[in-house]
Amino acid sequence: KYADYIERAFKIDNTAAFITPGHPEIELALVRLYKATGEKRYIELAKYFIDKRGNCDEPGIYTDWANEYYSQDEIPVRERKTAEGHCVRALYLMCAAADIAYIYKDNDLKTACERFFDSIVNKRMYITGGGGSSNMGESFTIDYDLPNRTAYAETCAAISLAMFAERMLKFGADSRYSDIIERTMYNGIMSGISLDGKSFFYENPLEIDPDFNNINTSTKVKERFPITQRVEVFDCSCCPPNIMRFVASISGLIYGFDDNTVYINQYMNSEGD
């Protein structure tokens, strides 16, 4: 019923206060709802939201840093060439774009997804698979801007990159995508949780020096640095449940298959049938 209400507000009656639904998540939910119910209007609504991004005639309501780039609304998805804006938002949006491209056999959208993937892994990703180098807007910045001590590299960003790579594998066996899942799983995601499973990193810096935390060692000027210890709760505790969701999904990442072949995408103790 709620999905039907969203369809009515955003697509049929146009009574919603804004054109695109903000943080990209509803698109992924609509794809799953379509698969669960077979109701085509849900996948059509997901496609509608993808098509509307960057295509709105009316200006959005933004702040200085929470702007069109932050909201993935600066350019149509099919024209996207680089990874921009809020890292997790961008990746969730492109997860849905990959789903839509696969279901509709949309080659233009698939090509945009490939460009986006290449932009991240070749120029805007840490060696750990972490993404997003700035705390301002939790965002991508420019090519090769990947400082270690101030790395944002949100745990959710690594998870969403693994989710995106998993979807890109649907287009055909390509080890680039399974390799990225492996890299993020062991380095960018599991770094976000303590061994006892009780404490978490929201950000995952590649270098921590407690003696100089929040101080630029070159200029001695105070700067913002990530926390140095994992904690149990954040003001925005999106990462802990996301880690739990990812861990529960690992078994589905091990194998891939088509009509004639079974592919081993992740090397770990497992059995398949």
Annotated model-derived regions:
Residues K1-D273:
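Glycan-recognition and catalytic cores of secretory/periplasmic carbohydrate-active enzymes
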